[in-house]
Design a protein with these regions (language model features):
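Short flanking/linker segments adjacent to small metal-binding domains or redox-active Cys/His motifs
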Residues: 99-129
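Mature extracytoplasmic domains of secretory-pathway proteins
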Residues: 59-94
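Sec-dependent bacterial lipoprotein signal peptides
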Residues: 1-17
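Bacterial Sec-dependent N-terminal signal peptides
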Residues: 17-36
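Post-signal-peptide N-terminal segment of Sec-exported extracytoplasmic proteins
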Residues: 37-72
Length: 129
């Protein structure tokens, strides 16, 4: 009788541990919606700043392709808080890299180069052809 009780108890404990592990995995999953919200926050932050003839523009690698490297480059005026922007972009890039692993994402693996020609058009930093 004790043996059956002990085995039953072990089975219950085992399943409880397995359930809590899968619950924690589910809560750590990154969604495409979360990435879109974070990207919009970054783009919105950048859009609050203007460039001019005296305020130049720069670019930062953004996103994470499944096979490595950035998906694109964001352009921004030099008046942004660069440390803040880098921090937000690095967080986003890390989340997207984690999302790629989590979803077994694939990409074209094409190397995206930083823009060579960035200019200020109507007070907005723009990649020029």
């Amino acid at each position: 009788m004790k043996s059956i009780f002990f085995k039953s108890l072990l089975v219950i404990v085992f399943f409880n541990i397995q359930c809590s592990k899968s619950d924690s995995k589910t809560s750590n999953l990154i969604t495409i919606q979360q990435l879109e919200v974070k990207k919009q926050e970054i783009v919105s932050y950048i859009s609050r700043f203007n460039c001019s003839a005296t305020v130049g523009c720069n670019s930062i690698a953004f996103g994470s392709k499944a096979c490595g490297g950035p998906k694109e480059y964001l352009v921004f005026p030099n008046t942004v808080d660069l440390d803040f922007l880098r921090n937000k972009v690095n967080q986003y890039n890390a989340l997207e890299a984690q999302y790629n692993i989590q979803t077994n994402a694939v990409s074209d693996c094409m190397l995206v180069m930083p823009p060579e020609n960035i200019g200020c058009v109507n007070n907005v930093c723009t990649i020029l052809d």
